[in-house]
Amino acid sequence: VKLAVFLGPSLPWAEARRLAPGATLLPPARQGDLWRALRRRPRAIALIDGLFEAQPSVWHHEILDALDAGVAVFGAASMGALRAAELGSSGMIGVGRIFGWLRDGAIRDDAEVALLHAGREHGFRALSLPLVNVRAAAALARERRVLTGPLAQALIESAGRIFYQERTWPAVLAEQRWTRRVRERFGALALPDPKAEDARACVLEAARFAGSGALLPVKPRAQAESSLVRRARAWDELAVAQARPDAAALADAGLRRALLAGWARSLGLAPLEPDLARARLRIRAGVARDEAERLAQDLA
């Protein structure tokens, strides 16, 4: 195997086969899949799509191990762009516009590339709209003078408030207070698909490398803190917490907080900025929430 490509909703497999006829196509990567791919002894790996949330995501260490083995690892479009932005200094090769946005800090949230998609039997068809596509559409609309700067920003912000599994163009456009003329002009645009564009570029670049005799440039591996060290420190902190007289109450509060956070994510809920600001202030002041609420009532 010269090239292994982890690909799902970003680009149809049929198109990837046309771009790189000899490539081995694999479904979106989950934790451990790059280690398994190394058994095929590829010259290059193109990491495009990957699983998250319900499945453990691709681990940084498996990418670093591939690089240490002399395998070129390219990343783009989705999970690949995220990991390439994080591991570019270690030798992973990022490709495309989304990678550039992440590398330069224009976007920071992993949720920007998240979407809901069908399974392999349905060709990993995208069922929702990633926020990066809305950003690209807003930029195009502003460039073509269809949207003003404020309207383009409002389009992105309103799309970001919709839970990623429920975000579609009809849902996003229903939130916009545009004139009929603006809607008609926006509807006439050929909306970009940066995920597909970046995936194509990544497959082509990885295929060119895999088919050449080029060697991977050697870069010093960044010394990441071992997971064993992190786990040992976590156990130490847990032992200190368990020795406290209120350990049971702390455990109950932590479990409740984790369950509520997971429930909120499943409903697509996110805290408002004023709530976040108050929480940050309480943390800096070292004041518990119930104490802050009692103080607010006393001052009212």
Residue spans for each PLM region:
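Catalytic-core regions built around general acid/base machinery
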Residues: 58-71
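Short, basic, glycine/proline-bearing loop/turn elements
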Residues: 43-52
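Class I SAM-dependent methyltransferase SAM-binding "motif I" and its flanking Rossmann-like core
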Residues: 79-118
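Acidic catalytic cores of enzymes that act on phosphate-bearing nucleotides/polynucleotides
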Residues: 172-246
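General beta-strand structural signal in soluble alpha/beta enzymes
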Residues: 26-27, 46-47, 73-77
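Charge-patterned, long linear interaction tracts outside catalytic cores
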Residues: 132-186
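Peptidyl-prolyl cis-trans isomerase
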Residues: 234-300
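A short, well-structured beta->alpha microelement
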Residues: 22-37
